[in-house]
Structure formats: C-alpha cells, structure tokens
C-alpha cells in the first residue's frame, strides 16, 4: 500500500464513500500483517480511529478489511501504541 497517502476514501455500511485521514501505517512481522489507522476526515475533533488490515489478492490488488480475530486485534493495538509513543 502506498505509504505517502494522507487521505483515503472508503465505502461505509450504506455503500457511501467516506473520506478518512490516514494516521499511520505499520507492519507486524510476527504475524505477517500490514495495517493502517484512519480517522474520519471531516471531524478533526473526533477521538475515534479505525484500524484496518491490508490484504492482497492473487493479482496484488490491495483491500482494507476489519480485524475480526481478537488475538490479532490485541497484537495490533499493542503495536499501534508502540508506534504512536515513538512518534511523540
């Protein structure tokens, strides 16, 4: 996934495009995962952030998906907190 993108547009549950600000990208080598953290672009005061997993199909096309596995989410949350503490 292109790492220099500041904003991305994603489809919400209703099929409408919503613009998100990219907070950070990071990789977790232990589980061979790549992740992106985004927040709604139109609400700068929003404390809500979404962590999405980057997956690739056989042709190399990338898609962002929610993290369903609780253990994976816990690892991702720990890695995100580490990344953010290093950026401060």
UniProtKB/Swiss-Prot annotation:
Listed InterPro entries: UPF0473 (IPR009711)
Pfam families: DUF1292
UniProt-listed HAMAP family: UPF0473
Family under the similarity heading: Belongs to the UPF0473 family.
Protein name (Swiss-Prot/TrEMBL): UPF0473 protein CLH_1128
């Amino acid at each position: 996934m292109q790492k220099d993108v500041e904003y991305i547009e994603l489809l919400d549950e209703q099929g409408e495009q919503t613009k998100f600000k990219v907070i950070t990208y990071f990789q977790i080598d232990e589980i061979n995962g790549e992740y992106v953290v985004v927040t709604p672009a139109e609400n700068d005061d929003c404390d809500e952030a979404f962590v999405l997993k980057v997956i690739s199909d056989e042709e190399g096309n990338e898609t962002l998906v929610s993290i369903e596995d609780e253990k994976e989410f816990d690892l991702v949350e720990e890695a995100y907190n580490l990344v953010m503490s290093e950026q401060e």
